[in-house]
């Protein structure tokens, strides 16, 4: 494959797709493409027809790829929404735990942290009054 003249990966991909196997397009779009390939004395109309079939196949591939990308984007957006909600819930829980923890509990928690770890804003699991975990 001669791709030296193509500068971007997209140009290379388009070149590769354009030069993809005629038999693949034939199976995808109909058997008449194979006859054009086998006919070495193809007329200009046959070449145009072949180019049109290739363009249709490329459009089909592009549409399928766009559909797959849109689906993946929707899945990722939903995951982001779920993570944002979980983050908000954890922030609310953290705020509640900060307000319920006594200064002694905060000091005890911070003393258990290793020296290389920065101290968090609040304990992760402080004990509630009475000695039980919240």
UniProtKB/Swiss-Prot annotation:
InterPro entries the record matches: TSC22/Bun (IPR000580), TSC22/BUN_CS (IPR047862)
Leucine-zipper: annotated segments: 76-97
This protein's GO CC annotations: cytoplasm; nucleus
Region (Disordered) location: 101-134
Subcellular location: Cytoplasm; Nucleus
Residue numbers spanned by region AP1-binding: 1-60
Presence of the UniProt keyword Cytoplasm in the record: yes
Residue list for modification Phosphoserine: 102
Main localisation: cytoplasm
Keywords, ordered alphabetically: Cytoplasm, Nucleus, Phosphoprotein
Superkingdom to which the source organism belongs: Eukaryota
Residue numbers of Phosphothreonine PTMs: 125
A Pfam short name: TSC22
Any GO BP annotation: body fluid secretion
Biased composition (Low complexity): 125-134
Biological function: Protects T-cells from IL2 deprivation-induced apoptosis through the inhibition of FOXO3A transcriptional activity that leads to the down-regulation of the pro-apoptotic factor BCL2L11. In macrophages, plays a role in the anti-inflammatory and immunosuppressive effects of glucocorticoids and IL10. In T-cells, inhibits anti-CD3-induced NFKB1 nuclear translocation and thereby NFKB1 DNA-binding activities. In vitro, suppresses AP-1 transcription factor complex DNA-binding activities.
Record note on quaternary structure: Can form homodimers, however it is likely to function as a monomer. Interacts with NFKB1. Interacts (via N-terminus) with JUN and FOS; these interactions inhibit the binding of active AP1 to its target DNA. Interacts with MYOD1. Interacts with HDAC1; this interaction affects HDAC1 activity on MYOG promoter and thus inhibits MYOD1 transcriptional activity.
Family in the record: Belongs to the TSC-22/Dip/Bun family.
Notes on the domains: The leucine-zipper is involved in homodimerization.
Protein's name in the database: TSC22 domain family protein 3
Encoding gene per record: Tsc22d3
């Amino acid at each position: 494959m001669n791709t030296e003249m193509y500068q971007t990966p997209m140009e290379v991909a388009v070149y590769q797709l354009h030069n993809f196997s005629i038999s693949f397009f034939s199976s995808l779009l109909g058997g008449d493409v194979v006859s054009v390939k086998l006919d070495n004395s193809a007329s200009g109309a046959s070449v145009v027809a072949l180019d049109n079939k290739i363009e249709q196949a490329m459009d089909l591939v592009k549409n399928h790829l766009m559909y797959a990308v849109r689906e993946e984007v929707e899945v990722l957006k939903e995951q982001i929404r779920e993570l944002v909600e979980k983050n908000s819930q954890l922030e609310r829980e953290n705020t509640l735990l900060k307000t319920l923890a006594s200064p002694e509990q905060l000091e005890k928690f911070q003393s258990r942290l290793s020296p290389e770890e920065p101290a968090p804003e609040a304990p992760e699991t402080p004990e509630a009054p009475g000695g039980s975990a919240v």
